[in-house]
Amino acid sequence: MKTTLTSFFTLLLLLSCSENLIIKEENLHKHIKILSSDEFEGREPGTKGGEKTKNYIKEHFKSLNLSPVSNDYLLEVPLSKMVVDLDKSYVNINDKTNIIDLLPGKEVVFWTKQVKESLEIHSSDLIFIGYGIVAPEYGWNDYKNIDVKGKTLVMLVNDPGFELKDPKLFKGKAMTYYGRWVYKFEEAARQGAEAVLIIHETEPASYPWQVVETSWSGKQIDLKRKNMGADRIKLEGWITSMTAQKLFSIAGLDFNKLKKQALNKDFQAVPMTDLKLSASVNNIISFSKSHNVAAIKKGRVYPDEYILMMAHWDHLGKREEHTEKNDHIYNGAIDNATGVAGIMELANYFSNIKTDRSLLFLAVTAEESGLLGSQYFAEYPPIDLSKLVAGYNFDAVLPIGKTKDIIVVGYGASELEDILKEELDKIGKYIMPDPTPEKGFFYRSDHISFAKKGVPVLYADSGVDKVSGGIKVGLEIANKYTNLTYHQPSDEYSPNWDLSGFAEHLITTSRMVSRLANSQEWPKWYDGNEFKEIREGNKN
């Protein structure tokens, strides 16, 4: 009996040690240092640095004897690049007597996702459509009792729950997918609209007008879709709140009154009297391609069922005009050499472990251009997405050291959080809910491409409640990164980084993955989640 107990505890010790030996901080340091070095030139897709990055990840997967998803570890992602020629393009609003030219950058930002050198809109009627949301699970339909085909829709950003801070309405102050600008353009296209102008307001958008101006002006990279964007609306854009109020006034409408009315599910869309939009959009177009890097560890029993571990490999590249200490390389050490290093270490860990289900390791491209690599994988999947059990995403993990918590972005989404809690309880850690749910970060990283297809996903970070220093010190580190380092040349690797917390995060993830990979569990979205019906439809 004594011998048996000794053997049992020895086995437990070996298992524990094996985890810590395989999830090695020194390997994380090595990968992050290499991927964020000047040699990789900021990892911009379509550049020499981008090629180096893809090949580095590919060779790592290959060295572990992981299988390619198809014939190669590199999965092509076709891209289009369009620049609106503002000297030849315009948007104006006219009524029976006046033509109002909207000033690009100052009053309006506009573009098209239809890959055409030029397109025009002539006298399209303006309609105020409230929030532009169709959400059956909330009994909400802003498009009821109105035909918007060929019309220009003017709408509010975010969703009604944010404005009222009512937890019973959508998700209260927490943004839902229905509040995201990308959803609003998608829904308008499904409804047959010709153009959309979203009214910008800083608080519900969670960023100032300057962000809109810089993000949607100049070069716009998108997927080169097979239909060349023919299913998108002709014109997508934003207008300032002041511009919106001016247009409502010209139409004889009270903007603030209608904004309040739009908070009610009985709201009925309002035609903006005689106001019509005309536009001409002229594009300079080019095409390129990048690649996702994918590898599979085949399962023994259910090889066609998958657990996903993912991160985006791209960053912002080089900006020759930058003069900060003559540093023009955006190295992206935290964003997102950390995440890539994480999935490379998880691949290393699982390469020698047999599982019943297959494991999919995916490093996606063009996240910084709008989550394009993950979107392409999800839209043209090389595997059956209905057999994708769950996904784990790593994006910009702070080297903050050991913490008592794990932050779950988009907290309250799926049963993956229950599994995470069970694992954290075993080691005396806890889940910290998303501290800023109103900013909608859950919808701003690559896992959302899979959530939109119904796949439960977990987007977690290593936490801020430091074992040494507590939440105050952790938040200081996080805020310093956000304010001084995020998307700056200063996002560089340091050998002094404390990656012990990240290593613990990866160990916890490995245990969650192991549980799902050796069972027939199918985690579900929580009731009321906007992706729940999609998942249930796929399973049926």
Placement of each model-derived feature along the sequence:
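Noncatalytic luminal/extracellular "stalk/propeptide" segments of secretory-pathway proteins
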Residues: E41-P167, T273, S290, E415
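Extracellular/luminal Protease-associated
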Residues: L103-N227, I233, Y306, H328-N331, ...
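Soluble metallo-hydrolase cores and metallopeptidase-like ectodomains found primarily
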Residues: N92-K96, V109-N145, N227-G332, N348, ...
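Bacterial Sec-dependent signal peptides at the C-terminal "C-region" and cleavage site
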Residues: L14-I23
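Protein/peptide-recognition domains central to ubiquitin and immune signaling
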Residues: K30-K106, F185, I198-W216, I221, ...
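Metal-dependent peptidase/peptidase-like ectodomains
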Residues: G105, S118, K144, L223-K257, ...
